[in-house]
Amino acid sequence: TARSRGLGDVYKRQLLGGFTLVRSANPLDVVTLNSPLELVVTIIHPEIEVKTADARAVLLDKLHLKQAIAQTANLGALVTGLFKEDYELIRRSLVDHIVEPVRSMLIPGFNELKNRANEAGALGTGISGSGPSVFALSKGMDIAQKVGLAMQKVYDEIRVPYDTHISPINSKGVKIL
């Protein structure tokens, strides 16, 4: 089952929609967070495989206290920014000090994707899960579409096939049609 493979929290987050915070994996405790109505996500998925085992293998076993403090501060600020609909606080808090520096090496053109997305107006850009998808959050659909074009240009230049998806944050989760 998904739970026995350690993926239960992933599937539950996908079913709930929106932003979720996994407070505990055992027992599973997931908190749903509100998000601003104008928040839009752009996701670019390079057609490459990054195995979860490989993505986990590059993670460091130990953290420096400064990294943990910075990451925790950014998480708290992100939750606050979402709650207060403070886009500038969201922008300042979308910095990953722990996972992104090592996992970004597994994703072709990651740094250029991030730079161009942010230059195009993204609030912030990061790795979705264990990769290889890269997400960018934007205020409004117009900016999100510009961000998508900027990211696509990077992969066009380095000849990496990709899919792109742009959507408002779905706070409702999965629906049966």
Region spans (language model):
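Active-site glycine-rich loop that binds ribose-phosphate moieties when present
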Residues: 5, 20-34, 62
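Single conserved hydrophobic/aromatic residue that forms the stacking wall/gate
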Residues: 1-11
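Short beta-strand-to-turn element immediately C-terminal to the catalytic PLP-Schiff-base lysine
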Residues: 14-25, 136-139, 177
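Short coil/turn connectors at secondary-structure junctions
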Residues: 8-9, 16-18, 37-40, 121-123, ...
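Short beta-strand segments
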Residues: 13-17, 23, 43-47, 127-129
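A generic local secondary-structure boundary/capping motif
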Residues: 9-12, 28-34, 79, 124-125
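Active-site rim beta-loop-alpha module in soluble metabolic enzymes
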Residues: 43-105
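Glycine-rich, charge-dense phosphate/pyrophosphate-binding loop(s)
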Residues: 82-177
